[in-house]
Amino acid sequence: MNIIDRFKEKILSGELISKKEAIILSKENVDKLASAANDIRMSLCGKKFNLCTIINGKSGRCGENCKYCAQSVYFKTDIEEYNLLDSESIITSAISNYNSGVHRFSVVTSGKKLTNKEIDIVCKTYSEVQEKCAIKLCASHGLLNYEELVKLKESGVIRYHNNLETSRRFFSNICTTHTFDEKINTIKNALKAGLQVCSGGIIGLGETMEDRIDMAFTLRELNVDSIPINILNPIKGTALENQEKLSYDEITKTFALFRFILPEKQIRLAGGRALLNDKGERLMKSGVNSAISGDMLTTSGIKTFDDIKMIKELGFEV
């Protein structure tokens, strides 16, 4: 039995692989690794595919200096800037997405965190969404504390999103205005508040494969529910506008490794896949079982109708 199959069988028997074993796997053939990751997904997660959409609920003028982000005040980009969206716009979007077949809907806002007044406004909006449609609500409002997260939970939010972005080791290379530990604390507080957690990161920032593996193991330790993996889309004006893009093999290997490390979780294809020539179809055969559909925060995405068609053709149930 080869190394890939040996570790696959270990996972299917109920054990978890170690970081050392993940690094060994990272040296293996990408196509064989992807096929095994798909076997793990099929055996442990089945055919169900989870689709979510996001809306940019507050855009630009962010005081954080994340090098990849078009919304940071540190960079001169062409993105639209606006304050918190009105409730009607958010509710209309939620209902529209629900009617298109999406399972989850998230409001994502720029900035380190929302103000108390803004939290009260979005909580009222979430309650109104729940009265009008059955879509599952997610939220991404920055580094909130426990009490603020409890408010979200009480308003109908089921899952809180807060990306680690990368490994602890590499984090200070992409952001210095907040810390990796602040993110960890937010995730722990969300779990304590009774919320599910969606947390992943961005690949292609200049990090190593070991950094990605480290991030995956941190997420496993935190026991998050959904792991969105974004592929860097270098945006003109940001510090990473000239960052070299990852090869599709490198991207595929990363997604497959995340399935090996987090065998029963939602490995979610997120931003950047519109850059891929097959819109991520290869990744959906490499361990992925969820995706963000539609537009991203500041870049165009893939229409939900087209996503559902492709996902069903691949044998998934949406």
Curated annotation (Swiss-Prot):
GO terms for biological process: biotin biosynthetic process. One of its GO terms (molecular function) is iron ion binding. [4Fe-4S] cluster binds at residues 62, 66, 69. Its cofactor is [4Fe-4S] cluster; [2Fe-2S] cluster. The keyword S-adenosyl-L-methionine applies. Keywords: 2Fe-2S, 4Fe-4S, Biotin biosynthesis, Iron, Iron-sulfur, Metal-binding, S-adenosyl-L-methionine, Transferase. The keyword Transport does not apply. SMART domains: BATS, Elp3. SUPFAM superfamilies: Radical SAM enzymes. Binds 1 [4Fe-4S] cluster. The cluster is coordinated with 3 cysteines and an exchangeable S-adenosyl-L-methionine. InterPro entries: Aldolase_TIM (IPR013785), BATS_dom (IPR010722), Biotin_synth/BioAB (IPR002684), Biotin_synthase (IPR024177), Elp3/MiaA/NifB-like_rSAM (IPR006638), rSAM (IPR007197). It catalyses: (4R,5S)-dethiobiotin + (sulfur carrier)-SH + 2 reduced [2Fe-2S]-[ferredoxin] + 2 S-adenosyl-L-methionine = (sulfur carrier)-H + biotin + 2 5'-deoxyadenosine + 2 L-methionine + 2 oxidized [2Fe-2S]-[ferredoxin]. Pathway: Cofactor biosynthesis; biotin biosynthesis; biotin from 7,8-diaminononanoate: step 2/2. [2Fe-2S] cluster binds at residues 106, 138, 198, 268. Pfam families: BATS, Radical_SAM. Residues 44-273 form the Radical SAM core domain. Homodimer. Belongs to the radical SAM superfamily. Biotin synthase family. Catalyzes the conversion of dethiobiotin (DTB) to biotin by the insertion of a sulfur atom into dethiobiotin via a radical-based mechanism. HAMAP family: BioB (MF_01694). This is Biotin synthase. It comes from Clostridium botulinum (strain Alaska E43 / Type E3).
